[in-house]
């Protein structure tokens, strides 16, 4: 018997609860997490019994098992901080769980994490994992019924001319209103259909403020219902490898009335890599393209000799043209940004001590901002930057407005993000290519889906060219 085992003692209660642990990794961490929980639950009469009942009879109704909420909502276990309901759902249900964005409480839960109460329920069977929504196929007419004279290319020219010289700016969460609590409206000359978050018909110089809330208390928004054209209604909720949940999204069976010869159904397919990331310094691309094979990706300023496939380490990349401003900015990237792809939604969580700045047309559409608005995400906050279902709605609506309208959506499939230094109307840098360190994220699923739809639509009436 060695010295470590001589002095280590696991209580019978902890051993009992560890009997229901899922997965075989991180035994010591799980043991410490359960031990910390037992110490809290022993102070509450009946709490231990209720937890054991929930774990032993997962199909049966059970009561909330609560612990006090900490100031920042997180719990520290062995030098690692995490949200309590995520920690214990990982221990007893889903070892590959990465983020609170992947969880939603059941209706029976009285103390869900997002309710901001003094107590937090950690009963793992009071939460469910967010499922990837099934996206309806886009129905492309086989024969265009639109007059070439009515092409929307001229509107795109106008939109480009009307866009401000510099992008507008917004700060999360102060500038963000609740997206579904305002009437629909539309920006003038915008090529996108009505955005759900706009409450003004003019470009906002500074978006409307709202209750900022807490970054630790922001559950994922309930996805909007899937969209099909009005004449064809259809009724429609470590890291995880891409081929487990995401690739199960098969197209639903089409109703008889739209199984007809005059439309071609183009279904969404999940690609092998959900995104690729390219790193830039000013207007120079640096290093190779990073392909995300995991639904959880870290982009940080460190070096990682182990070549972890879930990390894009910018500290490894060299550039002979690097100046002192870039060098100083790189030193402040630190833990960088955590990108999650869960339930058909992409989230960016700022882990750096400095803010990150995001330009996502899908996010801007959702919140009713001008398409080119740059959103500041402070340290410790996370923001949804892309929603597959909203993109599906736009894709299905735009197909009836011609090739050029559909092609415009390619801009929505690329997200730009700068570290430490921002750009736009409130900063002296006007364009992202003027920022020292930035990345461009290409979303492969939406891009490939859009490409297939455009292929079915055929050539535009007025081909887009360098002089169009």
UniProtKB/Swiss-Prot annotation:
CDD domains: MH1_SMAD_1_5_9, MH2_SMAD_1_5_9. The keyword Nucleus applies. Gene3D superfamilies: 2.60.200.10, SMAD MH1 domain (3.90.520.10). Residues 12-136 form the MH1 domain. Keywords: Acetylation, Cytoplasm, DNA-binding, Metal-binding, Nucleus, Phosphoprotein, Transcription, Transcription regulation, Ubl conjugation, Zinc. Residues 421-431 are annotated as: L3 loop. SMART domains: DWA, DWB. Disulfide bonds: none annotated. Residues 221-232 have a biased composition (Pro residues). PROSITE patterns: MH1, MH2. The keyword Cytoplasm applies. Belongs to the dwarfin/SMAD family. Transcriptional modulator that plays a role in various cellular processes, including embryonic development, cell differentiation, and tissue homeostasis. Upon BMP ligand binding to their receptors at the cell surface, is phosphorylated by activated type I BMP receptors (BMPRIs) and associates with SMAD4 to form an heteromeric complex which translocates into the nucleus acting as transcription factor. In turn, the hetero-trimeric complex recognizes cis-regulatory elements containing Smad Binding Elements (SBEs) to modulate the outcome of the signaling network. This is Mothers against decapentaplegic homolog 1. It comes from Rattus norvegicus. The lineage of its organism: Eukaryota, Metazoa, Chordata, Craniata, Vertebrata. The gene is Smad1.
């Amino acid at each position: 018997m060695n010295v470590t085992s001589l002095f280590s003692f696991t209580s019978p209660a902890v051993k009992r609860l560890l009997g229901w642990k899922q997965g075989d990794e991180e035994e010591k961490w799980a043991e410490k997490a359960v031990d910390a929980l037992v110490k809290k639950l022993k102070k509450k009469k009946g709490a231990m019994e209720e937890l054991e009942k929930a774990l032993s009879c997962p199909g049966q109704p059970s009561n909330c098992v609560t612990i006090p909420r900490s100031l920042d909502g997180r719990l520290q276990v062995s030098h690692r901080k995490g949200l309590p309901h995520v920690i214990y759902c990982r221990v007893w249900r889903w070892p590959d769980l990465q983020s609170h964005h992947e969880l939603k409480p059941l209706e029976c839960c009285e103390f869900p994490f997002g309710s901001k109460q003094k107590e937090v329920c950690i009963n793992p069977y009071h939460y469910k994992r967010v499922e990837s929504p099934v996206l309806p196929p886009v129905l492309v007419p086989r024969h265009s019924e639109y007059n070439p004279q009515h092409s929307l290319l001229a509107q795109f020219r106008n939109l480009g001319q009307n866009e401000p010289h510099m992008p507008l700016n917004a700060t999360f969460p102060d500038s963000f209103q609740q997206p579904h609590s305002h009437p629909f409206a539309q920006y003038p000359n915008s090529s996108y259909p009505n955005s759900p978050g706009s409450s003004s018909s003019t470009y906002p110089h500074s978006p409307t403020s709202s209750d900022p809330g807490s970054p630790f208390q922001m559950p994922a928004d309930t996805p909007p219902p899937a969209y099909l054209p009005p004449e064809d209604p259809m009724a429609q909720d470590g890291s995880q490898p891409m081929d487990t949940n995401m690739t199960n999204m098969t197209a639903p069976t089409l109703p008889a009335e739209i199984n007809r010869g005059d439309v071609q159904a183009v279904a969404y397919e999940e690609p092998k890599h959900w995104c690729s990331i390219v790193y830039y310094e000013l207007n120079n691309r640096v290093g190779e393209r990073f392909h995300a094979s995991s639904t959880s990706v870290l982009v940080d300023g460190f070096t990682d000799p182990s070549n972890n496939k879930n990390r894009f380490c910018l500290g490894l990349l060299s550039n002979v043209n690097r100046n002192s401003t870039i060098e100083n900015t790189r030193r402040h990237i630190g833990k960088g940004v955590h990108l999650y792809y869960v339930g058909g939604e992409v989230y960016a969580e700022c882990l750096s001590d400095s803010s990150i700045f995001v330009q996502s047309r899908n996010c801007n559409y959702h919140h009713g901002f001008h398409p080119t608005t740059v959103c500041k995400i402070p340290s410790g906050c996370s923001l949804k930057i892309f929603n597959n279902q909203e993109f599906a709605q736009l894709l299905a609506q735009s197909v009836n407005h011609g090739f050029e309208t559909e092609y415009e959506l390619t801009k929505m499939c690329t997200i730009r993000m700068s570290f430490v230094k921002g750009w736009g109307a409130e900063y002296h840098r006007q364009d992202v290519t003027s920022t020292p360190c930035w990345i461009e994220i290409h979303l492969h699923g939406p891009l490939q889906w859009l490409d297939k739809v455009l292929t079915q639509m055929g050539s535009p009436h007025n081909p887009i060219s360098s002089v169009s």
